[in-house]
UniProtKB/Swiss-Prot annotation:
The keyword Cytoplasm applies. InterPro entries: Aldolase_TIM (IPR013785), DeoC (IPR011343), DeoC/FbaB/LacD_aldolase (IPR002915), DeoC_typeII (IPR023649). The active site is at residues 102, 167, 201. Belongs to the DeoC/FbaB aldolase family. DeoC type 2 subfamily. The keyword Lyase applies. Its main location: cytoplasm. This is Deoxyribose-phosphate aldolase. GO terms for biological process: 2-deoxyribose 1-phosphate catabolic process; carbohydrate catabolic process; deoxyribonucleotide catabolic process. Its EC number is 4.1.2.4. Keywords: Cytoplasm, Lyase, Schiff base. One of its GO terms (cellular component) is cytoplasm.
């Protein structure tokens, strides 16, 4: 295998194969679950809206891939600062059967100078998730924060409040994952000494095997080779899968999403 193919194989097993579109249907989610069982191996997870969790669970079980995890989103995509609503949505996602919850950090509140509400919101959602053995990823929306100091601060607050992962983006704003924001966020994980318990997820804009290889190389450099396993690293993507399969010599269609 070439270096790119090795990276593509790694990346495929780290994918949160995603559809978060307003026109999602049961049929589209079923098709996504079928794609998660790829000829080159299973993706780590599918990421879908909460109402589709039951049909995804049924599909994954019936196709013999019960270990593919189901991630969903809460406080999404706007990252409002109403803790109670974020908590109610997170509890509902858990009740639907989510294995993982990706909650949006109240990033606009942080930009306005309020650090406390972000901590309190993540902490409340973490307590709900921990009680159900559900993984919590916190989306800090780096493309809106823009400023390196704010990206670092949002990462630090999320980690201190209990995040299991910090994630770049919703995929719903003009600027999503970038290597620059990834380096900032993984550097925080390294500098806080939490690499054993906290992972990183770039999302939105990671579309090719070459893109994925760059993120994995960055993770290897900052946090050590072997750190970026499925407990510590995910790609939030949809169209990436087709590129990975093509790189690995398989013919496959993408999901057609821009995520």
């Amino acid at each position: 295998m070439t270096e790119l193919q090795i990276a593509a194989q790694r990346a495929l097993r780290l994918m949160d194969l995603t559809t978060l579109n307003d026109n999602d249907t049961d049929e589209k989610v079923i098709a996504l679950c079928h794609q998660a069982k790829s000829p080159a191996g299973d993706t780590a997870a599918v990421c879908i809206y909460p109402r589709f969790i039951p049909i995804a669970r049924k599909t994954l079980r019936e196709q013999g891939t019960p270990d593919v995890r189901i991630a969903t989103v809460t406080n999404f995509p706007h990252g409002n600062d109403d803790i109670e609503i974020a908590l109610v949505e997170t509890r509902a996602a858990i009740a639907y059967g989510a294995d993982e919850v990706d909650v949006v950090f109240p990033y606009r509140a942080l930009m306005a100078g309020n650090e406390q509400v972000g901590f309190d919101l993540v902490k409340a959602c973490k307590e709900a998730c921990a009680a159900a053995n559900v993984l919590l990823k916190v989306i800090i929306e780096t493309g809106e924060l823009k400023d390196a100091a704010l990206i670092r601060k949002a990462s630090e607050i999320s980690i201190k409040a209990g995040a299991d992962f910090i994630k770049t983006s919703t995929g719903k704003v003009p600027v999503n994952a970038t290597l620059e924001s990834a380096e900032l966020m993984m550097s925080v994980i390294r500098d806080m000494g939490v690499a054993k318990r906290v992972g990183f997820k770039p999302a939105g804009g990671v579309r090719t095997a070459e893109d994925a290889a760059q993120y994995l190389a960055l993770a290897d450099r900052l946090l050590g080779e072997g750190w970026a396993d499925s407990r510590h690293f995910r790609f939030g993507a949809s169209s990436l899968l087709a590129s990975l399969l093509q790189t690995l010599g398989y013919d496959a269609k993408g999901t057609g999403s821009s995520y």
